[in-house]
């Protein structure tokens, strides 16, 4: 059996409903619904969720670990939320959050406007910092990757958009 799939999920104040193959996780920050694969059995035991493969196949075993991780992320998201921090490095690189849009000045001849998907918010504590928050880990990571993709850090000076915890290894310039 999957090692990840064996461990129970503590609900930490989240409310879980399971109905015809769909699990709904509700918490103080919002609600996430997720389809549960029929190869995985979900049992709700007062305050914890246990997942087990429905049969002994390799696919069911693998899916039990995957579903456990997805549901655990949903529980964490609706109780505490997820956030990704980005830093802009470079002269004139700026970010400004305006409602559900993120305006970026990244050295192009035009400003880059990124539309935030539903359930994801962007904040700019300073002009060179972006904090992306939401309850869905996948969406938060996807938006952060899209924003970073507009101007990834270049290897010689390190200019660009990078994750706050990212270490950019700089190359040495060509010697004569």
From Swiss-Prot:
GO cellular component: cytosolic large ribosomal subunit
Pfam families: Ribosomal_L6
Molecular function GO terms recorded: rRNA binding; structural constituent of ribosome
GO biological process: cytoplasmic translation
Domain of life assignment: Bacteria
InterPro entries found in the cross-reference section: Ribosomal_uL6-like, Ribosomal_uL6-like_a/b-dom_sf, Ribosomal_uL6_a/b-dom, Ribosomal_uL6_bac-type, Ribosomal_uL6_CS
Similarity annotation: Belongs to the universal ribosomal protein uL6 family.
Chain's role: This protein binds to the 23S rRNA, and is important in its secondary structure. It is located near the subunit interface in the base of the L7/L12 stalk, and near the tRNA binding site of the peptidyltransferase center.
Subunit-level organization: Part of the 50S ribosomal subunit.
Protein name (record): Large ribosomal subunit protein uL6
Gene that specifies this protein: rplF
């Amino acid at each position: 059996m999957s090692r990840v799939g064996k461990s129970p999920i503590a609900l930490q104040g989240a409310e879980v409903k399971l109905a015809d193959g769909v699990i709904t996780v509700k918490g103080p920050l919002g609600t996430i619904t997720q389809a549960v694969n029929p190869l995985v059995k979900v049992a709700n035991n007062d305050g914890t969720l246990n997942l087990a493969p429905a049969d002994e196949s390799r696919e069911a075993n693998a899916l039990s670990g995957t579903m456990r991780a997805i549901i655990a992320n949903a529980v964490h998201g609706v109780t505490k939320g997820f956030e990704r921090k980005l830093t802009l490095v470079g002269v004139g690189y700026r970010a400004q959050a305006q409602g559900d849009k993120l305006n970026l000045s990244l050295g192009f001849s035009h400003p880059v406007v990124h539309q935030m998907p539903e359930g994801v918010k962007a904040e700019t504590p300073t002009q060179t910092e972006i904090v992306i928050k939401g309850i869905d880990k996948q969406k938060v990571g996807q938006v952060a990757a899209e924003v970073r993709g507009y101007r990834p850090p270049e290897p010689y000076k390190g200019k660009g958009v990078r994750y706050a915890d990212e270490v950019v290894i700089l190359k040495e310039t060509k010697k004569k």
